[in-house]
């Protein structure tokens, strides 16, 4: 691994443009997004509906960047920071794999430059100030039963989904129900990822909805005078992190909103700085085209005024067979043929946004030549561009064909958004449900209708950031492959007025995940020499 300063000098940055965090990590100055050079080409990486283990979207993003570098391109990648929840939960580390990783992987996975703890602290500072205000006289007349801002922690802990605070004598605070969300679902995480400068950051923080008064009036973080101290905590967290891939490609790794319960992309400042420093930028969006990619097209790229010049859609034989109902070990051509419907539907989603994607078939050792050949024939017959990707095993060399096809697909596209910003919230939700998920309709529970009314009173033309299972186009994780004839049920709608969007809660999705029966944490260890093992 090279010193990060060597890579920074190759980029052409001066000493005032960055701050070192050890030998291998750095933070970049926010002013770099205003350099004013010609805009680069942005390549978005998304995926088909995944299995719980994931389909290698981050690995593909990294490997594609390495392949483009081998072709002589001036390229960088932009991915999200890992959360401790998945690291210790099902997935383990989230920095790529094999010969296509970002380094130093162990540090990036475990606290990195401190952005996640800082965002968690800023979020919980507001929670503390809300309760403190009610304890000391409650001048704003906040209703303890109508506090809408939860607490946060970067850990999967189902026991914190619903709690009581202030239990005990009067000096323990105000007794009230409360809850935790995981840090990637925190509104402060979203705000950090969407803010472009400190002025923007403070304005967004001040607009966070804290709760309502006993007379049903909204109270914001600005009313509690919390935005200044929150912004002070977030000063360095707003600056994007620069590291490198296995083969020395510059890698922006910044903020970490989940794609299923948040907006699912790396920070706008990371993308914008990368676009000003490189000719090609590859950025990823969480989970499938129905989640992270939908939010990138309809939300993030709109807010950041980002181009989208090409899309890569990651698929695996494993996931295709899963959606095809495969129950047997070894080759299963019939399951490939059946499960390919899921992939084709994701391709159509991207085409509906105005871009013809390139499918990257991320090869696993268990894939047979017959299965790959069968999938290739299906893709060819549907006019879908595709390439076999072997970047896990071979690094950049394993992605040359993919890189060439992606470069050939680059263009200036007129993006077709799913909804108009002037649409009302109900219409926006229904358009996403029908046009992206393929739902027949949407059912709004009583609480969702009440929440929607409040949101429309508080916010003007908000974006919509759906919270939905990643395992199905529907809101039911058991409906695999290419479901039809289903309706979406909106249980409630969270108001993220600081971030500028509402979060409809669909089906049984949780904003605080739980650990599996045998979490990845059981396999992680520290050796006597200080080496971390079991993260991958």
Curated annotation (Swiss-Prot):
One Gene Ontology molecular-function label: formate-tetrahydrofolate ligase activity
EC number: 6.3.4.3
Binding residues for ATP: 51-58
InterPro entries linked to this entry: Formate_THF_ligase (IPR000559), Formate_THF_ligase_CS (IPR020628), P-loop_NTPase (IPR027417)
Catalytic function, reaction form: (6S)-5,6,7,8-tetrahydrofolate + formate + ATP = (6R)-10-formyltetrahydrofolate + ADP + phosphate
The keyword Nucleus is annotated on this UniProt entry: no
Top-level class of the enzyme under EC nomenclature: ligase
Keywords: ATP-binding, Ligase, Nucleotide-binding, One-carbon metabolism
One Pfam family hit: FTHFS
Family: Belongs to the formate--tetrahydrofolate ligase family.
Protein name per Swiss-Prot or TrEMBL: Formate--tetrahydrofolate ligase
Organism whose genome encodes this protein: Thermoplasma acidophilum (strain ATCC 25905 / DSM 1728 / JCM 9062 / NBRC 15155 / AMRC-C165)
């Amino acid at each position: 691994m090279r010193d990060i300063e060597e890579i920074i000098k190759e980029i052409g940055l001066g000493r005032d443009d960055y701050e070192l965090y050890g030998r291998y990590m750095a933070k970049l100055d926010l002013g770099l997004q205003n350099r004013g050079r010609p805009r680069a080409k942005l390549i978005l990486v998304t995926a088909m509906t995944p299995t719980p283990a994931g389909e290698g979207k981050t690995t593909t993003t990294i490997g594609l960047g390495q392949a483009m570098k081998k072709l002589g391109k001036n390229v960088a990648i932009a991915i999200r920071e890992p959360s401790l929840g998945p690291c210790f939960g099902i997935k383990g580390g989230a920095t790529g794999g094999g010969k296509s990783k970002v380094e130093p992987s162990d540090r990036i996975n475990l606290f990195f430059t401190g952005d996640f703890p800082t965002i968690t602290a800023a979020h919980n500072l507001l929670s503390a100030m809300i309760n403190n205000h009610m304890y000391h006289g409650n001048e704003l007349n906040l209703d303890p039963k109508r506090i809408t801002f939860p607490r946060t922690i970067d850990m999967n802990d189902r026991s914190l989904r619903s709690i009581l605070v202030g239990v005990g004598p009067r000096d323990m605070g105000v007794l009230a129900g409360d809850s935790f969300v995981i840090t990637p679902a925190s509104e402060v995480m979203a705000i950090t990822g969407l803010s472009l400068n400190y002025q923007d950051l403070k304005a967004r923080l001040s607009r966070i909805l804290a709760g309502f008064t006993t007379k049903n009036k909204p109270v914001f973080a600005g009313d509690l005078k919390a935005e200044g101290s929150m912004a002070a905590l977030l000063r360095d967290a707003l600056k994007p992190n620069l590291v490198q891939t296995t083969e020395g490609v510059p890698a922006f790794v910044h903020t970490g909103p989940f794609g299923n319960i948040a907006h699912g992309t790396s920070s706008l400042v990371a993308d914008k700085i990368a676009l000003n420093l490189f000719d090609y930028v590859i950025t990823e969006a969480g989970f499938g085209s129905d989640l992270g990619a939908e939010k990138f097209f309809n939300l993030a790229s709109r807010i950041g005024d980002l181009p989208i010049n090409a899309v890569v859609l990651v698929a695996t034989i494993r996931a295709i067979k899963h959606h095809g109902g495969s129950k047997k070990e070894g080759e299963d051509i019939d399951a490939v043929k059946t499960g390919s419907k899921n992939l084709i539907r994701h391709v159509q989603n991207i085409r509906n946004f105005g871009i013809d994607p390139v499918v990257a078939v991320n090869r696993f050792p268990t894939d047979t030549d017959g299965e790959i050949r069968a999938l290739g024939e299906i893709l060819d017959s549907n006019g879908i561009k595709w390439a076999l990707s072997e970047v896990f095993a071979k690094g950049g060399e394993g992605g040359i064909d993919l890189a060439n096809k992606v470069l050939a697909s680059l263009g200036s596209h007129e993006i077709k958004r799913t909804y108009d910003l002037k649409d009302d919230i109900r219409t926006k939700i229904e358009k996403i449900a029908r046009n992206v998920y393929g739902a027949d309709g949407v059912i709004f529970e009583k609480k969702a209708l009440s929440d929607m009314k409040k949101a429309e009173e508080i916010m003007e033309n908000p974006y919509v950031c759906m919270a939905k299972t990643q395992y199905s186009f529907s809101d039911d994780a058991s409906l695999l492959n290419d479901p039809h004839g289903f309706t979406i049920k909106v249980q409630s709608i969270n108001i993220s007025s600081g971030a500028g969007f509402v979060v409809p809660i669909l089906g049984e999705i949780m904003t605080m995940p739980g650990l599996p029966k045998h979490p990845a944490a059981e396999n992680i260890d520290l050796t006597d020499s200080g080496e971390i093992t079991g993260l991958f």
